């Protein structure tokens, strides 16, 4: 992997990009072409690009290496912020209370992690307790054999193993439950402060995950490093936009359909722009749009 960008190399920039990449570089199949060149251009221009994913830290390592991404990323759908070693020389601060407090951090692999959700195995135990209390059977991925894991995720065995090695959330599926049982399970879980997110045929459960808090913590670090506020710009496809756009100051929707067909990605009071997802010059168009200063 290329060396991480460090704080002294942060240059004057009006914006920090937050890009939801799971539909741009999907776990299976071909991704959108040109992302690596786009990443290189952003680096050359000194524009940080934070990637957001529902994948795990280990699962996300290969896509980051392949596309030359050396900036922070938000993984497990808002469970934590991961900072490459040496990226900032600033200690994260919490906004709680009148005076800024040192935010707790973890060392996970090559990264300094700002945890937002409660770390495993707390969510795993809460899931097991809920399943037992309601007599609704669930199967966590960690309980599967390597062959069963690959079959249920649709991933090659090595990638499937990385997918279930999580830091904060637990992946699982329901085992023969009716729709009514599933709804009852989810409702009771939410009452217990569990956060459920669908991921295809799978579900994830976490405690305290929040994309908004991830962006807030990271934006505070960038503002301190730059000594001014850089605008939060969100970039996403329609299916991922609702989880990102409400927390951004400016948004860019990547879609081949008319933006009016995606009302769920509209956010009141936020300037939204649109670029055709599968246009030949997608990333050049994105750069053109980003060059338009508010």
Task: Locate each region found by the language model.
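Non-catalytic pre-domain segments flanking phosphatase-related domains
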Residues: 1-21, 66
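Short hydrophobic/aromatic-enriched beta-strand-loop microsegments
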Residues: 70-76, 158-159, 251-256
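Hydrophobic "anchor" residues
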Residues: 24-27
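Short, surface-exposed amphipathic charged segments that create phosphate/polyanion-binding patches used
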Residues: 87-92, 153-156, 288-293
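Active-site phosphate-binding/coordination module
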Residues: 31-141
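Residue-level detector of anion-binding/catalytic polar loops
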Residues: 48, 195, 250-251
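Mg2+-dependent phosphoryl-transfer enzymes with acidic/Ser/Thr/Gly-rich catalytic loops
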Residues: 8, 12, 32-34, 201-294
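Conserved acidic, metal-coordinating active-site core of Asp-based
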Residues: 130-233, 239
């Amino acid at each position: 992997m290329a060396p991480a960008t460090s704080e002294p190399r942060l240059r004057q920039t009006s914006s920090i990009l937050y890009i939801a990449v799971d539909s741009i570089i999907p776990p299976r199949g071909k991704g959108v072409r040109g992302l690596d060149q786009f990443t290189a251009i952003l680096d050359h221009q000194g524009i940080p690009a934070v990637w957001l994913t529902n994948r795990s830290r280990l699962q996300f390592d290969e896509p980051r290496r392949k596309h030359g991404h050396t900036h922070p990323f938000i993984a497990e759908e808002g469970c934590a912020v991961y900072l490459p070693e040496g990226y900032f020389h600033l200690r994260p601060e919490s906004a709680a209370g009148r005076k800024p407090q040192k935010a707790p951090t973890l060392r996970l692999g090559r990264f300094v992690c700002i945890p937002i959700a409660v770390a495993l195995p707390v969510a795993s135990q809460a899931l097991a307790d809920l399943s037992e209390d309601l007599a609704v059977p669930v199967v966590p991925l960690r309980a599967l054999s390597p062959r069963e894991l690959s079959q249920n995720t649709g991933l090659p065995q090595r990638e499937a193993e990385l997918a279930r090695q999580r830091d904060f959330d637990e992946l699982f599926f329901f085992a023969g439950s009716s729709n009514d049982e599933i709804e009852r399970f989810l409702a009771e879980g939410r009452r217990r402060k569990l956060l459920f997110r669908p991921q295809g045929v799978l579900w994830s459960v976490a405690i305290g995950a929040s994309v908004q808090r991830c962006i807030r913590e990271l934006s505070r670090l960038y503002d301190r490093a730059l000594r001014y506020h850089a605008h939060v710009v969100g970039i996403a496809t329609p299916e991922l936009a609702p989880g990102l756009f409400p927390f951004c100051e400016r948004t860019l929707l990547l879609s081949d359909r008319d933006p009016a067909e995606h009302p769920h990605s509209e956010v009141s009071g936020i300037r939204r722009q649109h670029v055709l997802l599968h246009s030949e010059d997608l990333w050049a168009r994105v750069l053109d749009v980003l060059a338009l200063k508010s």
